[in-house]
Amino acid sequence: MNLPPTLPNIPPRNPPRILVDADACPVKEEIYRVALRRAVAVRVVSNAHLRVPAHALIERVVVSGAFDAADDWIAEAVGPGDVVVTADILLAERCLSAGAAVIGPTGKPFTGGSIGSAVAMRAIMADLRVGGDVIGGPAPFRPADRSRFLQALDEALVRAGRR
């Protein structure tokens, strides 16, 4: 799928917002620190109650426990200029098509050029699991991932602010 880098008819949000697919996100504390330093609003979306810092820039959004409810909420709320943090490839694809920047919790950016192969690989792995093949999960989260994420989030916010 070829996704546009921006949506020309919709102006980007300025300043950008950060939307977080938060249920299994290992970098929430880092997101809060960066957001407060840069004065950027954050929406922390989950299907369970999560603790978030009490600050006007940080909003907790608790959705129903229905399958993909958090993903659906984020996909409907996101727009050009926003930055989304998620490990969910299908949500990343939806957010990219809405004109947002998307990065994974390890700092890997999802782009219009990379999302197609990520979706295809996800489908292959799902087929292998259904077929009973034992495949490993993601690599353990490391301190280097945290550093890479912080750098990627800063870069995404700088780019979003320039749009």
Which role fits each region the language model picked out?
Residues N2-R163:
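Nuclease catalytic cores that cleave nucleic-acid phosphodiester bonds
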